[in-house]
Amino acid sequence: MSSQNSALVSVIGRGFDGLDIASLATDLGATFAQLDDLGTTLDQILVTVPEGDVVLQGTGVMDFDAKAAAALGIPFVLISNAPQRTSDLALAHARSLGAEVVGAFTDVASVPGALAAIESVAPVMSAEVFQKQLLDQARAAGAHIVLPQGEDDRIIEAAGALMAGKVAKLTILGDEADVAKRAELLGVDLTGVDVIDHLNSPLAEEFAADFAELRKKKGVTLEQARETMKDVSYFATMMVHRGLADGMVSGAAHTTAHTIKPSFQIIKTAPGASVVSSIFLMVMRGRLWAFGDCAVNPNPTAEQLGEIAVVSAKTAAQFGIDPRVAMLSY
């Protein structure tokens, strides 16, 4: 959307009565919408905001309106009937929330001219903005993800939300009747989700044979492999290994070690990587940061630290970060 033809209009010291925000949108050649109609949370608004140039009538809650403008990456306009000092403080607060502030006006007539002076506005990174970016990226990829912890209500609720948003193809591991019952009790629609009972699936025997072959040098027998495949993390990892899923999301009810161990035994590390590591993606101060390694290697060697830095930078780049690496004190 264009910064010169989009804006979010909020008020202070007055209401929206007598302000023709819709006509302002028409003058700018933009779509008009009311923030209240788009949702009650920033993540809802980010999904439902109209495409292209848009003029939004805010809620009148200046704090929320400023956060919405920052998240959407559109200029923030304040229509004020308050004392100058109050307006100045409100604008300063809006800037502190990341909003690109155009100014405070007594009516909308001066807004188009003020917007013309704005060169460009980019969305300020926040948890909601990052979530939308991730969902958009996942939706474009159309990946098939296996969720091994089907007994966890959070997994069922997350699966329902992902299916409603058409984000990915999903497989849940668990007893089909139990998963269906939990979904019904939670009011979650799992239409389109594949549910595999890993304990009774014919895939279990195939996976056991493959695992026994992979681990035969470690002395793993077929009978031991069959027992191993009763573990949802191993079964799900074998699905990824065999190309039956593109990825696995685990850890809701298991430790990091329990989740990583099957991958290390079956899939191994990427070419050029000798050590397993992790990164944490965190939104702070309007930016997206990647921290690695905070979970796997408590006392890495100098060589391992260097390798972790390189691998972490490559992973960060996949999430839109232009990586500049800083080595923190260990």
Where are each of the predicted segments found?
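Short hydrophobic alpha-helical runs that function as membrane-insertion/retention elements
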Residues: 75-80, 103, 146-147, 169-172
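Anion-binding alpha/beta catalytic cores of soluble intermediary-metabolism enzymes, centered on
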Residues: 124-330
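Short, charged/polar "capping" segments at the starts of alpha-helices
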Residues: 16-20, 84-90, 110-111, 155, ...
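Short beta-strands and strand-loop turn motifs
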Residues: 56-57, 78-81, 105, 292-293, ...
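ATP-dependent carboxylate-amine ligase catalytic core
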Residues: 1-89
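C-terminal lobe/tail of nucleotide-utilizing enzymes
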Residues: 1-14, 22, 26, 88-129
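Short, well-structured alpha-helical segments in soluble
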Residues: 42-50, 93-96, 234-240
